[in-house]
Amino acid sequence: MLNDVCYKKMIFNSPHYCIFVQNISGMNTTDQVEKILADTNLSTELQNIAHKVLHGERISFDEGVYLYEHAELGYLGVLANFVREQKHGDKTYFNRNFHLEPTNLCVYDCKFCSYSRLLKQKEEGWALTMEQMLDIVKKYDGEPVTEVHIVGGVLPQYDVAFYSALFTAIKQHRPDLHVKALTPVEYHYIFKKAKIDYATGMRLMKEAGLESIPGGGAEIFHPEVRDQIAKDKCTGEQWLAIHEEWHKLGMRSNATMLYGHIEKFWHRVDHMERLRELQDRTGGFQTFIPLKFRNQHNQMSNVPEVSVIEDLRNYAIARIYMDNFDHIKAYWAMISRETAQLSLNYGVDDIDGTLDDTTKIYSMAGAEEQNPAMSTKELVNLIKQVGRKAIERDTLYNVVTDFENVVFEEEKKPAYYKLPVVN
């Protein structure tokens, strides 16, 4: 059976991949894409979906499911890249960030999680003090990072007062550092404990210094799946409600979807549909981030991981379906550098940030990158190698540096594969 390494070598080295990349790169007009699709044998359903996408029309729930069940990778890549280039051209975004993970101790017992430890397993975990967390932040004094990403387990002593004080202390120490922190899983827990509603809680967090919310904790919204893999924590409806209250304050957030485990294709589309509906109402989401299920060191180790082909199909369908989301992100640390590069031709326009080996959430689940860290130079080169323009952004997608004409000294490609370069 082919593994992901074999798939990647086949894709990168295949002449069909080179032709495909050369055909779709810069193919951002309707006529150009229609010409490519006219040379293929498509079902009536796929022709109708392509027509909708190329003319800016929204595809339906049923059409989303049909794409998962019937569309081939090449077709999806052409359409997803069309949407990507309509929105962003060749621009690919990244940021300079670091993660702050207060604890891996957690009151919840999610079946897919390789990171957390229950409170009864304290000897296997950590719980940082406020001072220790601030010491981590201070390590980056003088460094050109723009964001601290705070997320971890749910621990009872980390309550509304604790996180409010933490956010305030970070902003007082370094006002220019954007605080992106906690998911609705944490917020639901601490607000319930404090006996305050979501609207009040989110207002308090904003006043304390919170500036945006990451997309974690979404998993799969539908209770048919959620009750099996994460039954104890907030429901899909509660997750969405917390983001909606945050958006009402004029603030921004991201959204994720955990795919490739026990869910069916229609569960994925249901998940994206709920996000799309909320985005129609609030416009507060910036980025949609599909997260690949990893099966190491968790209670779902018997579930096989999906292939890189399915990863790329999923990114492409997400880009096609999530028409009101500006950005689709691939976490390079989770899927590998090579797959992240491939994803840039399947709808992805953001590959996250430098990380600086500050997260254990990916590596403990068996991610490709066990010590996730890349310099700015490495990230820029990674993007340029596949013919895209590297843009350093801040959390809100303001441009920090356009690296289009920047050439680093001793710019080299990794030796373990050779990518076709598109001019």
What role is predicted for each listed range?
Residues 3, 9-10, 23:
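Polybasic, lysine-rich low-complexity intrinsically disordered segments
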Residues 20-74, 141, 279-423:
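Auxiliary Fe-S-binding modules of radical SAM enzymes
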Residues 56, 80, 110, 150, ...:
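Conserved, mostly hydrophobic/aromatic
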Residues 65, 75-119, 125-151:
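N-terminal pre-triad scaffold of radical SAM enzymes
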Residues 66-67, 117-257, 261-270, 274-278:
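Conserved Radical SAM active-site core
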Residues 92-98, 148, 179-183, 213-215, ...:
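Hydrophobic faces of well-ordered beta-strands that scaffold small-molecule active sites
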Residues 98, 151-160, 223, 296, ...:
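Glycine-rich, proline-tolerant flexible connector loops at the mouths of alpha/beta enzymes
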